[in-house]
């Protein structure tokens, strides 16, 4: 068998989901060697943009069959063979995660649901995240029973039975449950094999019209840089389809707010791709998988401090329209998941303010007319979206925004 060439870019995105403090970030660290919550360091280093994305190589030992992320087998020290490169999306804040997950922006091809063995199952966010996977139809799921080093065998078995009971009748009913200790890196090899077996790389169409969601944007120039040495603005995001190449002319929507006379409107930006990077690897072209840094000729003032987060990038003339109002058909959940009380969700009503997530965009909206499950919404910030796109809907419950369902754009 010919050796598989090592990939420069990840080919599949796997979401790390689960209750707070159940070990998502530690597990990402055990798999990739990267702590994903490290924003200030990330900005200091410039362009290694990973929005809590971290990649790892899955490798297999040809001698003893061990799965590992290392070039040499930890068991027999033979040289290992490269299988594929995967990217883990470890989203930090759980409430924003819920909305982002639901709007499909995190573009997960599969998910690892992390459940701690030393707490009763399910915890509120465990329920909330599994519901999000259900709504999104993400059915390539592996359940990780973490922190088994903190419980005895009997407790581990009881927790395992609780997990089985919890997932019965859900999208994760047949998901494998793998006991591990992320802290001691125990059973990580078994998890790597499960990722290979249960979360395949989806078939992607390289000829599809390229499109990308912008998750971050920055100015990478140091203060005091000479004008001749200034670099253009940088976009960090996830490609959802097609292939972008260095040299491509691109359009960014909704763009920037422009006032001419007494009229204010949003004007799309056009620019050129001058560089592409996945982590620290420079690319000539980029496909879906992992987070991609896109260097442009834009004035860095336009991209600083995440100013273009929520935008959509494509080839000129191929993007959906900019919408300042939308009509959605809402699918509301029965109860507010993730709260202790699990309050009943009331229907949408005219005049109410909602928080909406579409792609990587977040905007507030006021319902101008609600009739049954159809609502007309005026948006505070415009979005670039197609008919049929999904919108995550959150409502103020007490002092925080709570996910109450999703909608489909109808107009």
Swiss-Prot record:
Region of interest (G2), residue spans: 46-50
Keyword match ATP-binding: no
Residues at which Mg(2+) 2 binds: 21, 46
Binding site for GTP: 21-26, 146-149, 181-183
Keyword Zinc: yes
Domain tr-type G: 9-203
Region (G3): 90-93
Residues bound to Zn(2+): 61, 64, 73, 76
G1, as annotated region: 18-25
Residues that bind Mg(2+) 1: 25, 48
GO MF term set: GTP binding; GTPase activity; metal ion binding; translation elongation factor activity; translation initiation factor activity; tRNA binding
Quaternary state and interactors: Heterotrimer composed of an alpha, a beta and a gamma chain.
Role summary: eIF-2 functions in the early steps of protein synthesis by forming a ternary complex with GTP and initiator tRNA.
Protein's name in the database: Translation initiation factor 2 subunit gamma
